[in-house]
């Protein structure tokens, strides 16, 4: 009876109830969808880090990460490699030579970490070979008499290996992408012009386009104007095993693009055989072994086993290599719950205000109910149920809308191309696929019910304090 009465009371003032319900719906929808976008970005970041950058476990000399000394190689590397491969749970392992050096072109230079790899085993551990930008080459797949290097897009831009141009073919491509005629006319003034750097290109383009045009079409213009000459050259210089400076000219095998601009800027991959010739290291001298597991959940178990087997070496899991990723994955659920609690706390004030108005408007009615024998517990429960119903209707509607939108955007994703540089500078992808677990919806529903109950306490107590005789005299 109380449940039915409370439900009818919610709709006695439809306008007021709908205002509260709509505000709750918008709040829940915005909160849940924002959480889905953030969760999708973080899951993609972790997935990219494990598949393209660091894999699951690293093995190296205990002092190697302090200064990346070329002398700190893994002793008995063949035996260590065999031990790792024989450990249950290990899917693949690759060996690397790691040295620090400088990458130079005729106009620019940058500090880099040079990684000597075997392309075949590297493909088994990481998927960096799949990130090669079309038209720039490949991952050491084409035979060449030159020494080759596989570099990141950010480094290629810094060294002016990637340049920008605007000509008739670029303008035609932009027209095919349905850019407005007025934008094409503005860009036509640069027809036939080549830009030496991304900075100069952006400066010139910004000079002729409005802020709105830059925001809407900047990413497309940059993509079409992008220019690369196959097998461009750069020089790598570094110290050999005898601490003598050495170096060589490398041709660009390909350019990779991932969502981490810092990684792109600092990591240069070359063939191990080429690097060992230049450094004087032996064919079995490796600084690092990268391990890929069959199952991510077995990381701690496998690392513990390897630490026991390889006690003289440092064995680090991906959580130890990049603790910020570990923190995100471990704390993410708590953070999202706190985020939703803050939103619901703000919405609770609206519910409290509405229920206080309800009590004020129905003072005479509540006094009459008390006078004819309805006890205080029933009055309290009725007010509480009205608040819970308001919260649930708005909350469930918000959840349904957010679930629908998340499902529709999860397949195609949300493209933040206009903010790609900012996202990549922080190591996040600019194309995000929202995702959220079903358990989170359950958590939100429980929080909504709790919000309704807590929001009803003060108004319900106010109702209980009403004197029936005074309330009946209220007009």
Model-identified regions with their sequence ranges:
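The feature marks short, hydrophobic/small-residue-biased sequence motifs that occur predominantly
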Residues: 97-167, 171-192, 252, 272
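Short helix-loop junctions at transmembrane helix boundaries
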Residues: 331, 381, 396-443, 457
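A hydrophobic alpha-helix feature that marks transmembrane segments and, especially
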Residues: 34-40, 335-371, 379-384, 452, ...
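Short, strongly hydrophobic transmembrane alpha-helices
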Residues: 16-40
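C-terminal membrane-exit region of the final transmembrane helix in multipass inner-membrane proteins
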Residues: 436-475
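Hydrophobic, regular-secondary-structure patches
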Residues: 31, 35-113, 119-145
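Mechanotransmission and gating elements of multispan inner-membrane complexes involved in transport
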Residues: 190-336
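Transmembrane alpha-helical interface segments in multi-pass membrane proteins
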Residues: 356-358, 364-410, 443
